[in-house]
Amino acid sequence: MPKVTLYNTAGAAAGEIELNDSVFGVEYNEAVIHQAVVRQMANERLGTHATKTRGLVRGGGRKPWKQKGTGRARVGSIRSPLWVGGGTVFGPTPRSHAKDMTRKARQLAVKSALSEKLRANELIVVDAINFDAPKTKEVVKFLAAFNVDGKALIVDGGTASENTVLSARNIPGVKAYAPSGLNIYDIVHYTKLFLTC
């Protein structure tokens, strides 16, 4: 079982903690992580893109001129794709971009990403984050204690997690939520990951 230093909110070491080997000791699997990230991003797409074909554009039911005898090219509708104001050929239609992935593979991706964060020293375990009130400056002070100036993800399982979420949401590049919201995209996207025990 991997041992990591346990910190307090001031950035000082407060002891050691053993992490579960089945979660934080998993071999790095880039392919599964990539598949999970692509799946999550694809599932967030609305897929409402649409264009009108010649059958959907309003008008064009009447033949503009007779077939023969005018000297002009034959035409059956003013909504032909060749005409200005006509329909679109092979344009996008509404569809689902959803991708599927087995539960075990999704879990493996999260475990693999968390294990890699630990190996890269980008995972910081904090004993508790207790903000009395939602104050942005408290999170700024907390991040400064760990010399974090880039992207940071705070996963707070404590009782005051709502205060943490509200305090962090006004800082660019910083996100905070309860453990139930943890997802593969955020683990990969944010440089530093803070976990409370």
Identify the function of each model-found stretch.
Residues 1-46, 91-197:
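Extended polybasic, low-complexity segments that bind anionic RNA or targeting/receptor surfaces
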